[in-house]
Amino acid sequence: MDYGDDDRSSSWNWQVDNYNHQPQSHFSDVPDCTMTEVTLNQEDHSYMFDDENTPVKACSELGYHVTTEDTNRKMEVHSETRSALKRRRMLQFEDQPETSLFSSESFSAILKSSARDDTFDELLPEGSQLIEGFSEDASASSFEGLDLYAEEWYADCLNDAETPMLPDDLNFGSPDVQVDISEYLNVPPETETREVQRPVTRSSPNVIFKGRKSFSRPVSKLPSSIIYPFAFIKPCGVHGGMTLKDINQKIRNPPAKPKAHIEEPAVIQTSAFSGKPVVGKTKIRTEGGKGSITIMRTRG
């Protein structure tokens, strides 16, 4: 099919691409007409035979493509986005974590060395790799300033008296470390309850126990200390004290009971009027105080 002469094709930027699509289906002996034929009353089963003969992909089989500047830009942007997506998909992460810049060995080497002529690469083995990633056009003066700044920082750390100095070996759990714990061992132990040791009463061999064995311990009679007065134990007759004979007599012969006091019978008065014995008298003083009245009670 002729779309025009060569001048017109060059002005319209016609591009001729010869695409040779070879079907990759396993049904090579089946003709193409049966593969692409779609009936009106039945469903389309073309996707089951070959992926290349879909309606959308059939449009790509055109022999000529009309392209303009706008379409070229869109295709370039689309290709860049697809390449970026592919790059994101191809990102791979390392299984092992990156080692820290300040490892224990490098930090101990920094504290040990007192010289200030150590280079940045010797102290930080990974520093060179970080610097290479910045830019190749960086001037040497910037790196010299970085080295000077690092040297000043290390010098301040070494000259600072308040910085805690770490030991030579960072193996704090090594068996060479010795801790003095004698102060903790001298602490007096806690008061423990001690059981009172009771004397065991031994029974004579002639005694025979009958019945069940009793688990209750018999109450042991402890000898009590009794204090006696010296005069009672060893009296002395020189000082007028009691002798042992007097003590024995008092023990053997208890004191006699005191005799009851016998009162003499009182004289019973009799009444002068009746002659009967008087039981009680009541004397009443008069108002003037000059005289009195006596009332007697008689028996009988």
UniProtKB/Swiss-Prot annotation:
Name the domain of life this protein comes from: Eukaryota
**Where would one find coiled-coil regions in this protein?**
none
A Gene Ontology biological process annotation?
pollen development
Give an example GO cellular component term for this record: nucleus
Keywords linked to the UniProt accession: Meiosis, Nucleus
Q: Does the keyword NAD apply?
A: no
Q: Subunit info? A: Interacts (via C-terminal domain) with MIP1.
Chief subcellular location equals: nucleus
Where does the record place it? Nucleus
> Effect of gene disruption?
Complete sterility.
Q: What does this protein do?
A: Required for mitotic division of the generative cell nucleus and the development of mature tricellular pollen grains, and for male and female meiosis.
This entry's comment on induction and repression of expression is:
By X-rays and bleomycin treatment.
**Alphabetized InterPro entries for the sequence:** XRI1
Misc. remarks from the entry: The induction by X-rays is dependent on DNA damage signaling by ATM.
Q: What is this protein called?
A: Protein XRI1
Does the keyword section mention ATP-binding? no
